[in-house]
Curated annotation (Swiss-Prot):
Inhibited by the nonsteroidal anti-inflammatory drugs aspirin, naproxen, diclofenac, meclofenamic acid, indomethacin and their analogs. It comes from Mus musculus. Keywords: Acetylation, Dioxygenase, Disulfide bond, Endoplasmic reticulum, Fatty acid biosynthesis, Fatty acid metabolism, Glycoprotein, Heme, Iron, Lipid biosynthesis, Lipid metabolism, Membrane, Metal-binding, Microsome, Nucleus, Oxidoreductase, Peroxidase, Prostaglandin biosynthesis, Prostaglandin metabolism, S-nitrosylation, Signal. Its cofactor is heme b. GO terms for biological process: bone mineralization; brown fat cell differentiation; cellular response to fluid shear stress; cellular response to hypoxia; cellular response to non-ionic osmotic stress; cyclooxygenase pathway; decidualization; embryo implantation. The record marks 516 as: Aspirin-acetylated serine. GO terms for cellular component: cytoplasm; cytosol; endoplasmic reticulum membrane; neuron projection; nuclear inner membrane; nuclear outer membrane. This is Prostaglandin G/H synthase 2. GO terms for molecular function: dioxygenase activity; enzyme binding; heme binding; metal ion binding; peroxidase activity; prostaglandin-endoperoxide synthase activity; protein homodimerization activity. The gene is Ptgs2. It catalyses: (5Z,8Z,11Z,14Z)-eicosatetraenoate + AH2 + 2 O2 = prostaglandin H2 + A + H2O; (5Z,8Z,11Z,14Z)-eicosatetraenoate + 2 O2 = prostaglandin G2; prostaglandin G2 + AH2 = prostaglandin H2 + A + H2O; (5Z,8Z,11Z,14Z,17Z)-eicosapentaenoate + 2 O2 = prostaglandin G3. Changing residue 565 to A: Decreases acetylation by SPHK1.
Length: 604
């Protein structure tokens, strides 16, 4: 009887033991598999390493590691020696060779096909096939692990509100030393909300953006029904209205398209576009209007080139051209600005035609999380000689009509955005969204910052001071988390020490760039089957893509062709910027209308 009791206790003890993979024993992208209740095995297949925990490099791997420079060294080389890079940029063969390396080295870090999601920390058909999930770069921490980060740290993470208040909230506006402006900030928000569309009814691990990439559903609508309501069904064009001699989106009343507006917004100011949340701020509606005009402009060009084409072919081909324009602008203007490189990035799909590359993409929840760049937002928005608070700006399309697109572009080109890394620069007005980002990361059981750094071939941080580059916030973080190996991903990205004169720290760039470039170049239009003139209506359509830039987009669609770029020409804080957000009028209770979208999209 006693023997049976001992056996029963032993069995119960084993069944309640922590998953042996909770300690993340497998290194260098080796995969941990439990074998019994207290044993594990690391699968080192094709990692270039071997041994019990995949820690011993193979011969060729050892040589590669000896020769490979650190990410910070590569960044330094690319952001210095301008004279050398000017020469490289003018030698097509050399420029293409370097660009090919940039694309392949980054894309290699992204699993394709996708592997995990919020509910499956192991390979499964469901994780591969179910498009309603965001994928994951790292599997979630197992439910049977003793602590939120596996085995390290306390059984509970620090209060998210306390983390927010101590190291994330803005004391005073910190401008981006890289000179990013509000044209950049709103482009980022507008562009990414075609694939960051969290389905909050199902949970933060789910998405409503089933295209998982650059499909321009934020222009054309996620569903066929929404698309049809937005289309004119004549000459391939989208519906529009003319106000003061200029083209703007149609109204909700005229299209019967669902948009999110507070009930007090007049019907004539409820513009209807592809993304239902773009009525939130006029900066988003500005870009929505520009792309509406661009689509209809391209339709006119194709109609002249192909009078034999019907409405459907004109519409579909114009959409493909706009996808191409978007990718080119993102790589050659947007990513170019973010990188700070003297090397000129190049959009050329043919660079990958002889490489092992999969033309598919799945958006990762970590990519969504790291893109929460709310520190970009200023305390007030300056248009012409007027200054608007958050409260005045929200759901106010009348500002767009009052000033017009020309003044919007000129003003946002001049107004500097905030620095994202370095801590304490999240505006008070969006603190609820930042807190939700922390809470949702916990709900999705993200692994620690250092596990993500190792996953993307970065050395783990050994202290909070190494993370922040200073002592005050490091001390706050140590009091909150106790162990650097327990530091959460999202807060870490915002407190990480920025690279010299840069908007981001190392982790943001080294995690974000692979997701971004794989998503852009994995688009079907970049494949050998699609990337040819006939796909885009001939040489005329192909030329529209290959000559696209943020400046040409503005010139072709905004009266007067105002100068624009993604950085201010003199990266200094604007004179009208509010100095202290915590003492300004942009308090959270001033922006009650955002309650309307909290359940729909914490990305905003």
């Amino acid at each position: 009887m006693l023997f049976r009791a001992v056996l029963l206790c032993a069995a119960l003890g084993l069944s309640q033991a922590a998953n042996p993979c909770c300690s993340n024993p497998c290194q260098n992208r080796g995969e941990c598999m439990s074998t019994g209740f207290d044993q594990y095995k690391c699968d080192c297949t094709r990692t270039g390493f071997y041994g019990e925990n995949c820690t011993t490099p193979e011969f060729l791997t050892r040589i590669k590691l000896l020769l490979k420079p650190t990410p910070n060294t590569v960044h330094y080389i690319l952001t210095h020696f301008k004279g050398v890079w000017n020469i490289v940029n003018n030698i097509p063969f050399l420029r293409s060779l370097i660009m090919k390396y940039v694309l392949t080295s980054r894309s290699y870090l992204i699993d394709s096909p996708p592997t995990y999601n919020v509910h499956y920390g192991y390979k499964s058909w469901e994780a591969f096939s179910n498009l309603s999930y965001y994928t994951r770069a790292l599997p979630p921490v197992a439910d049977d692990c003793p602590t939120p980060m596996g085995v390290k740290g306390n059984k509970e993470l620090p209060d998210s509100k306390e983390v927010l208040e101590k190291v994330l909230l803005r004391r005073e506006f910190i401008p981006d030393p890289q000179g990013s402006n509000m044209m950049f900030a709103f482009f980022a928000q507008h562009f990414t909300h075609q694939f960051f569309k969290t389905d909050h009814k199902r949970g933060p691990g789910f998405t409503r953006g089933l295209g998982h990439g650059v499909d321009l559903n934020h222009i054309y609508g996620e569903t066929l029904d929404r698309q049809h309501k937005l289309r004119l069904f004549k000459d391939g064009k989208l519906k529009y209205q003319v106000i003061g001699g200029e083209v703007y989106p149609p109204t909700v009343k005229d299209t019967q398209v669902e948009m999110i507006y507070p009930p007090h917004i007049p019907e004539n100011l409820q513009f209807a576009v592809g993304q239902e949340v773009f009525g939130l701020v006029p900066g988003l509606m500005m870009y929505a209007t520009i792309w509406l005009r661009e689509h209809n402009r391209v339709c006119d060009i194709l109609k002249q080139e192909h009078p034999e084409w019907g409405d459907e072919q004109l519409f579909q081909t114009s959409r493909l051209i706009l996808i191409g324009e978007t990718i080119k602008i993102v790589i050659e203007d947007y990513v170019q600005h973010l990188s700070g490189y003297h090397f000129k990035l190049k959009f050329d799909p043919e660079l990958l035609f002889n490489q092992q590359f999969q033309y598919q993409n799945r958006i990762a929840s970590e990519f969504n999380t790291l893109y929460h760049w709310h520190p970009l937002l200023p305390d007030t928005f300056n248009i012409e000689d007027q200054e608007y608070s958050f409260k005045q700006f929200l759901y106010n399309n009348s500002i767009l009509l009052e000033h017009g697109l020309t003044q919007f572009v000129e003003s946002f080109t001049r107004q500097i955005a905030g620095r994202v890394a370095g801590g304490r620069n999240v505006p008070i007005a969006v603190q609820a969204v930042a807190k939700a980002s922390i809470d949702q990361s916990r709900e999705m059981k993200y692994q620690s910052l250092n596990e993500y750094r190792k996953r993307f071939s970065l050395k783990p941080y050994t202290s909070f001071e190494e993370l922040t580059g200073e002592k005050e916030m490091a001390a706050e973080l140590k009091a909150l988390y106790s162990d650097i190996d327990v530091m959460e991903l999202y807060p870490a990205l915002l407190v990480e020490k920025p690279r010299p004169d840069a908007i981001f720290g190392e982790t943001m760039v080294e995690l974000g760039a692979p997701f971004s470039l794989k998503g852009l170049m994995g688009n079907p239009i970049c494949s050998p089957q699609y990337w040819k003139p006939s796909t885009f209506g001939g040489e005329v359509g192909f030329k529209i893509i290959n000559t696209a830039s943020i400046q040409s987009l503005i010139c072709n669609n905004v009266k007067g062709c105002p100068f624009t770029s993604f950085n201010v020409q003199d990266p200094q804080p604007t004179k009208t910027a509010t100095i202290n957000a915590s003492a300004s009028h942009s308090r959270l209770d001033d922006i009650n209308p955002t309650v309307l979208i909290k359940r729909r999209s914490t990305e905003l």
